[in-house]
Amino acid sequence: MSRVSQARNLGKYFLLIDNMLVVLGFFVVFPLISIRFVDQMGWAALMVGIALGLRQFIQQGLGIFGGAIADRFGAKPMIVTGMLMRAAGFATMGIAHEPWLLWFSCFLSGLGGTLFDPPRSALVVKLIRPEQRGRFFSLLMMQDSAGAVTGALLGSWLLQYDFRLVCATGAVLFVLCAAFNAWLLPAWKLSTVKIPVREGMGRVMADKRFVTYVLTLAGYYMLAVQVMLMLPIMVNDIAGSPSAVKWMYAIEACLSLTLLYPIARWSEKRFRLEHRLMAGLLLMSLSMLPVGLVGNLQQLFTLICTFYIGSVIAEPARETLSASLADARARGSYMGFSRLGLAIGGAIGYIGGGWLFDMGKALQQPELPWMMLGVIGIMTFLALGWQFSHKRTPRGMLEPGA
């Protein structure tokens, strides 16, 4: 086996272990934020939505800067620093009793993510061969789902005792992850050439096709982020207990572990990437429309199942598509900018979703936020269809198996 092949194989295992620690640390804390501050402390959903939206926007909106700096200086220092900063954010969240302190903790958490997320994504593109990326992204998503339900279960159990224990556990996991990277991650460069920060960012901004694709995905993310805000609140309201939230993540884990990899393997040779992304988005959008009208957990979990199946179809295609469109000369910058759609869509989804949720309750129209989200998803579906029409997309780039 050549040294390059050996490095790729070892790199795969490193990425999987690193990803599991990050997912566990994140999901121990974040799914329970809305439960803690809205249901237990009585804050308005808008206040919590601002905090979650701020974290999302800081982490993803500034990702191009984190990616460009990583292109210049390498992945390791950025990843280690970012993970320690997120640990500090979680520790601060544990003592948050005023909205400003929650916002500050989410700001720290988001800034840490700005530093470690783009170089980690770029390492996947660097280490995984193009023909294997779709399946590897599926494996990462399966791991994400298993880690999410494990983290949510652990966090829900700890929440019975003290929210500070929840945050301390998340902080410790990110400190461990920082140590793991500091110890084992080689000083790899992310791009094929060492370019100045400004040049890497300039390459991305000049790629109009990539920029349009990323910005269009903002509507997709407005729906996706509700698994952290409105869906947990909805489950808690109907069930009358925050412990029911863990079953929502258990559903996601079961569907991902059983369906994600088989669907990715079956569809990658039969359908174009953009068609898989659009099909999943349409299913997610249609499942959102009736959520506000349900009256029991069985109906709600059925819609959540449909939403997750849509995500299982869409997510591997979205990740693979983003990676395939990236310029190898500025991988970090491209993968950082690819998070801008999540920054915009996530911030609007959290803040706008929280505001609409409060407004729907005040007007006694609980279906209002869900109808709006469904409409936004359908509009995004149509926008992607226009962008990926044959007149705009060169044939071959996004073909099955390309």
From Swiss-Prot:
<feature type="transmembrane region" description="Helical">
    <location>
        <begin position="13"/>
        <end position="33"/>
    </location>
</feature>
<feature type="transmembrane region" description="Helical">
    <location>
        <begin position="214"/>
        <end position="234"/>
    </location>
</feature>
<feature type="transmembrane region" description="Helical">
    <location>
        <begin position="45"/>
        <end position="65"/>
    </location>
</feature>
<keyword id="KW-0813">Transport</keyword>
<dbReference type="Pfam" id="PF07690">
    <property type="entry name" value="MFS_1"/>
</dbReference>
<dbReference type="InterPro" id="IPR036259">
    <property type="entry name" value="MFS_trans_sf"/>
</dbReference>
<dbReference type="InterPro" id="IPR022855">
    <property type="entry name" value="Multidrug-R_MdtH"/>
</dbReference>
<keyword id="KW-0812">Transmembrane</keyword>
<feature type="transmembrane region" description="Helical">
    <location>
        <begin position="165"/>
        <end position="185"/>
    </location>
</feature>
<protein>
    <recommendedName>
        <fullName>Multidrug resistance protein MdtH</fullName>
    </recommendedName>
</protein>
<feature type="transmembrane region" description="Helical">
    <location>
        <begin position="300"/>
        <end position="322"/>
    </location>
</feature>
<feature type="transmembrane region" description="Helical">
    <location>
        <begin position="244"/>
        <end position="264"/>
    </location>
</feature>
<dbReference type="InterPro" id="IPR011701">
    <property type="entry name" value="MFS"/>
</dbReference>
<dbReference type="InterPro" id="IPR020846">
    <property type="entry name" value="MFS_dom"/>
</dbReference>
<feature type="transmembrane region" description="Helical">
    <location>
        <begin position="99"/>
        <end position="116"/>
    </location>
</feature>
<feature type="transmembrane region" description="Helical">
    <location>
        <begin position="368"/>
        <end position="388"/>
    </location>
</feature>
<feature type="transmembrane region" description="Helical">
    <location>
        <begin position="340"/>
        <end position="360"/>
    </location>
</feature>
<dbReference type="InterPro" id="IPR050171">
    <property type="entry name" value="MFS_Transporters"/>
</dbReference>
<dbReference type="GO" id="GO:0022857">
    <property type="term" value="F:transmembrane transporter activity"/>
</dbReference>
<dbReference type="GO" id="GO:0005886">
    <property type="term" value="C:plasma membrane"/>
</dbReference>
<keyword id="KW-0472">Membrane</keyword>
<keyword id="KW-1003">Cell membrane</keyword>
<comment type="similarity">
    <text>Belongs to the major facilitator superfamily. DHA1 family. MdtH (TC 2.A.1.2.21) subfamily.</text>
</comment>
<keyword id="KW-0997">Cell inner membrane</keyword>
<keyword id="KW-1133">Transmembrane helix</keyword>
<feature type="transmembrane region" description="Helical">
    <location>
        <begin position="277"/>
        <end position="297"/>
    </location>
</feature>
<feature type="transmembrane region" description="Helical">
    <location>
        <begin position="139"/>
        <end position="159"/>
    </location>
</feature>
